[in-house]
Amino acid sequence: MGRWVRYIWFLFPALAIGQSDLDTTRYFKTYPEALTLRTSATLTGNSFVFRDLGNDIRYTLNPIRSTHFQTSLQFRALELGFGFSPGWLNPDRELEGSRLFNMDFRIYAGKWMQTFTYLDQEGFRADLDGTTFYFPSFGTRKVGGSTSYVVNPKFSFRSLFGQNEWQLQSAGSFVPRLLAYYTRYRANLGEGEDTLHTFDIGIGPGYHYNWVLHERWMLSAGNTTGLGISFLDSGPETTSYWLWETQFRATLAYNTDTFFAGVGGQYTFYEHAAGRDLRLDDRIYYLQFFVGYRFRAPDSWNAAAARINRTFGWD
C-alpha cells in the first residue's frame, strides 16, 4: 500500500502542472484539457554492426520484424505509448518465434523531459557476401531512458512528441541530455544459451529547432551528440569501454485544435570501442507516419488537476 501512495504522489505534479490559466502563449499553444490519442505506422528496429578492423570483417544483424503499429495516449504532462508487430506487416513472417514489442513513457515537468523505453525483439538476419542468414534464436532486450532539459522557454519540446502543444512562432533551444541504457543479448546456437549484457551511460549537448512554415505546418530538426562509458558483462568478467553516441531527429507535422498528422524520423548511433580493433555499433532507428485526435478529457480529470494546482499553488 505504501508503494502505491508514493507512486500516486510522484505522478500528481506531472498530471497537474501546466498552463492552466493561460492556454496560449506568444510562442506556443497548449491543450491542458485535452486527452491526446496518437497512432502511427512505424518502421523501427535496433540493429547491430560488428567490425573486426584487424581482420577487415564486418557484418550487420538486422531484426526480422521491423514494421509495427504504435499507439500513445497523453494527458497534460504524462504520455504512455506501446507498439506491436503483426505478422502480416513483415515479409519474413513465416519465421516462427520472431517478435517486436516496445513501450515508451514520458513525463514533462516544466523544462524537463524524462523518457523511459522498453524494446524487445527476437529474430535477426545478416547479409554476408550476397547470402542472407537467419538467426531466429538471437534476441535483444533494451531498457533505459534519458533526461533532457530545454534551455529556451520559448521552445516547445512537446510539439515533437505527443503533440499536446503546438509551436506558434519559430524557436530553437539547446537541449542537454543524460542517457542510460541496459541491453541484454541472448543467443541459442544449439549448445545452450549464451547471454551478453551491456550498460551504457552518456551525456552530451543538443540543439533542436522548430520552423513554423504556416500556422498549421511545422518542420522540426535537431541533433544530440555526446560521450560516455559502456560496461560489457560477458559472464567471466566485466570490462569498460568508451562510448560515442549521436542522435538525429526530424518531423514534419500538420495541426488543428483537434486533428493532427505528420511524418517523423529518428536515428540513434552508439559506437562501442571494444579494444583497438573491435567495434560494436548499436543503431536504433524509426520512420513513422502518424495521425491523432484531441478529445476533451473527462471533467473529473480536469477538476482533480485543478484542485491539485490550487492546493500547491501551481496556478
Predicted features by range, described:
Residues 20-26, 77, 109-111, 147-167, ...:
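Outer-membrane beta-barrel proteins
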Residues 31-37, 67, 76-78, 110-114, ...:
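Outer-envelope beta-barrel architecture signal
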Residues 44-68, 79, 83-94:
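Surface-exposed strand-loop-strand hairpins of Gram-negative outer-membrane beta-barrel proteins
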